[in-house]
């Protein structure tokens, strides 16, 4: 028996540090099941599958704003390293794909954009693939309390902040529902926590969904965003085509 990251480092001919990072990023699986613990003891002949990570791509750019497609498994904070001179305006969870906006730091437009977020004048639309059948549009209004340690975790609590999510079913197949999701507030993990709250967790959500899944990622995609006269759309990856 040997620690998983050490076996992976030999298989991929990479350092132990890189092997740990791949596992921690959710990119390594065994027999279709995601490996969650880098130090897990496994047989030395274990074979891993390592998922490749796409690079971010430009959707739109002008003197004010840069709209990017963020693939899953890239930290939002790392996007600025790909595009020098731009500052991150908002963020998506690591495994969430979709449109992310950057602006010129401390520019006049940057200040206006930050105010738009603060005033809830930004319209966002997501796609989520969830467990179970949801047949009607509904509003989920449940306060969310977030704990921030090494990793953020949120839950429904009367002590939490107001959180409102609107879901609309787009397609139902094999006891799964593809949802259009709108949010009136922007709490940490809001969509993920609200969908768990109504017993329809997002497929592939290893934090809030205990059901096993063959999905290689969290099935949540930031589809559209609009603010200050701009509107952008990131086409959903093929895994959302059910």
From Swiss-Prot:
Q: Name one GO biological process term.
A: enzyme-directed rRNA pseudouridine synthesis
Which superkingdom, per the lineage? Bacteria
Residue ranges of domain S4 RNA-binding in the record: 2-62
| One Gene Ontology MF term | RNA binding
Which SUPFAM superfamilies does its entry note? Pseudouridine synthase
Swiss-Prot/TrEMBL keywords:
Isomerase, RNA-binding
Q: Report the EC number(s), separated by commas if there are several.
A: 5.4.99.-
InterPro entries according to UniProt: PsdUridine_synth_cat_dom_sf (IPR020103), PsdUridine_synth_RluA-like_CS (IPR006224), PsdUridine_synth_RsuA/RluA (IPR006145), RluA_PseudoU_synthase (IPR050188)
Active-site residues (renumbered): 93
Q: Which Gene3D superfamilies match?
A: Pseudouridine synthase
Catalyzed reaction equations? a uridine in RNA = a pseudouridine in RNA
Q: Which family does it belong to?
A: Belongs to the pseudouridine synthase RluA family.
Would you tell me the protein name for this molecule? Answer: Uncharacterized RNA pseudouridine synthase HP_0956
- Name the lineage: Bacteria, Pseudomonadati, Campylobacterota, Epsilonproteobacteria, Campylobacterales
